């Protein structure tokens, strides 16, 4: 499955400036997803991080990973954000290996590594030109509203 920005807007509860995914290039519901974030100089966070050396904040890279995790789960026909809420319970083993700067295309890969009842653990990777920029494990809880 693939999703364009209009599909993502319908799938996720986020909006500008916090919607960080531009497209999803591959998705197997409840298994894996690959998403793209086009990092541009016009991002509002670059105003202060850092004015003379713009670097995407690591916390926003992790947020982009979390949004890809949401797509992975919400693309399942039985889930949608109107009827379900996903709560992030933990972010573990986060590592930032390479700065992400304006002009980069951030490719985010998430894989479900453990699922039990209403919780999912994801292994997440963010790459620029196939070089690992960041990685983390995210634990999330899916609750019916």
UniProtKB/Swiss-Prot annotation:
Catalytic activity: a (3R)-hydroxyacyl-[ACP] = a (2E)-enoyl-[ACP] + H2O
Xref: CDD domains: FabZ
Listed InterPro entries: FabA_FabZ (IPR013114), FabZ (IPR010084), HotDog_dom_sf (IPR029069)
Gene Ontology CC terms, in alphabetical order: cytoplasm; membrane
EC nos: 4.2.1.59
Residues of the active site: 49
Chief localisation class: cytoplasm
Subcellular location: Cytoplasm
Pfam family, one: FabA
Protein keywords: Cytoplasm, Lipid A biosynthesis, Lipid biosynthesis, Lipid metabolism, Lyase
GO BP terms in the entry: fatty acid biosynthetic process; lipid A biosynthetic process
Gene3D superfamilies: Hotdog Thioesterase
GO molecular function ontology, one term from the record: (3R)-hydroxyacyl-[acyl-carrier-protein] dehydratase activity
Xref: PANTHER family: 3-HYDROXYACYL-[ACYL-CARRIER-PROTEIN] DEHYDRATASE
Family according to the record: Belongs to the thioester dehydratase family. FabZ subfamily.
Function: Involved in unsaturated fatty acids biosynthesis. Catalyzes the dehydration of short chain beta-hydroxyacyl-ACPs and long chain saturated and unsaturated beta-hydroxyacyl-ACPs.
Name recorded for this polypeptide: 3-hydroxyacyl-[acyl-carrier-protein] dehydratase FabZ
Gene giving rise to this polypeptide: fabZ
